[in-house]
Amino acid sequence: MPVTMSQAFIDNFLGNSPKWFKIAILSFLVINPIVFYLNPFVAGWLLVVEFIFTLAMALKCYPLQPGGLLAIEAVIIGMTSPSQVLHEIEANLEVLLLLIFMVAGIYFMKQLLLFVFTKMITKIRSKVVVSLMFCIASAFLSAFLDALTVIAVIIAVAVGFYSIYHKVASGKSFTDDHDHTSDSHGEGHSLCEDELEAFRGFLRNLLMHAGIGTALGGVCTMVGEPQNLIIAAQANWQFGEFALRMGPVTVPVFISGIATCFLVEKFKWFGYGQQLPEAVHKILSDYASYEDAHRTKHDKIKLVIQAFVGVWLIVGLAFHLASVGLIGLSVIILTTAFNGVTNEHALGKAFEEALPFTALLAVFFAIVGVIIDQQLFAPVIQWALSYEGNTQLVIFYIANGLLSMVSDNVFVGTVYINEVKAALLDGQITRDQFDLLAVAINTGTNLPSVATPNGQAAFLFLLTSAIAPLIRLSYGRMVWMALPYTIVLSIVGILAIETGFLGEMTQYFYDSHMLIHHSVAEAAKGAVTGH
């Protein structure tokens, strides 16, 4: 039967996506202008829900195309303007540069990272200990590096492990070329499905623990997350003061997070507790031995160079010697120059992982433009400001948390701190209350947002990365595996604020002269525009 033009159009539209998904996206494109004409506010929230839907279907169809179509239509019908989208991209240029250069830079440090983490996994047999090490290492790194950088590192390691196992299990040697994305191979070799599933589960566990670790560490310091920098600038806090003010909330949360990691692994809850199969452990151990035996002086000097560049990376970011993206660019230049990677094709491979996500983030900023232009969050902010004292802090924490679960936490944190700054300058709140609110906003945007990949850019990057389909890490599975952490981190954060512990410890820091009282004039002088 010949294919009609309409059938060909539907077949081509969004490629191999399910037909129902294609129809859903086309329906959204038809419905949105009508709803916008009737009620712009409702249309704005409808668009946000639709965009979240495209993210949830990331394994069926990469969100750039369906989300991009929704964003383009939103601009065309006037929900936001091209200038507003450009403004959002300009305000978040550091995040885009981070994705373009830092993730590519990490690609050229993969040998060192694979060396370190292979040793960690092959030498330590206890899954609980390995999980705790991944979580704590991610938290420590995220306090100095951006969470996206840390997740990029862990993804690179996981892909390395997966490809090594897949290659050997498919009947090839360590040095052979191999496509690790295909589970069917000729020559009579077939992968053991149970073994492969168990290994996928093991890698899922490690990646989720690492992802949560980035949130635990990222909330602690002003360089941990992009919104932390914006909040610190608004409040005129330096590195030490930021960490100290966050401490009454972040320290109990960190301890609780590590305890949760231990418990879910020990009792195999929420899909955790997957053991590394003995056969896979043997392959990885053999690979480590093979690499050690065949490591030439050229290989060893490459590892040394990568280690030195790694030190520069941590020092450069910890002391904020340049913007994150530019430090990433320097990592690319230093590792490739001293390790002899001068072929354009070899350089290009490093950018394959991050550029689709960079484009997706630019689309996300178009949705953020709609949220701003249609004032979708305005009612929530006004309601939260109507309360006082500890109750106000808790409400801001919860309101930030709920919105960060469905929207980018950089955006949510920026909107809230700007609104609270405006309230301070209007005389609605005192400077000390503003400082406490800044802590509530920072912790509120960073901690509950682990609930879904929407809030944490690092989680979204993980969901849309090359490793996710290989280890069967879907949107729903991420939400389920993050659930125990979401509950524990959110509740401990609320209790630290609700019980007055944050206020009491902050007062103690004032009395001990570890902190100083800031003035409203300082805040007015230090105002930055953020978004």
From Swiss-Prot:
Q: Which stretches are transmembrane? A: 23-45, 66-86, 97-117, 130-164, 206-226, 244-264, 307-327, 352-372, 393-413, 451-471, 478-498
Name any GO cellular component annotation: plasma membrane
Q: Name one Pfam family in it.
A: NhaB
Q: Which reaction does it catalyse?
A: 2 Na(+)(in) + 3 H(+)(out) = 2 Na(+)(out) + 3 H(+)(in)
Q: Which InterPro entries match?
A: Na+/H+_antiporter_NhaB
Q: Which UniProt keywords apply?
A: Antiport, Cell inner membrane, Cell membrane, Ion transport, Membrane, Sodium, Sodium transport, Transmembrane, Transmembrane helix, Transport
* Single annotated GO MF: sodium:proton antiporter activity
Report the locations given in the UniProt record: Cell inner membrane
Membrane topology is:
Multi-pass membrane protein
Q: What does this protein do?
A: Na(+)/H(+) antiporter that extrudes sodium in exchange for external protons.
Spell out the family assignment given in the record's similarity comment. Belongs to the NhaB Na(+)/H(+) (TC 2.A.34) antiporter family.
Q: Which PANTHER family match?
A: NA(+)_H(+) ANTIPORTER NHAB, TRANSPORTER ARSB-RELATED
Q: What is this protein called?
A: Na(+)/H(+) antiporter NhaB
What's the source species for this entry? Shewanella loihica (strain ATCC BAA-1088 / PV-4)
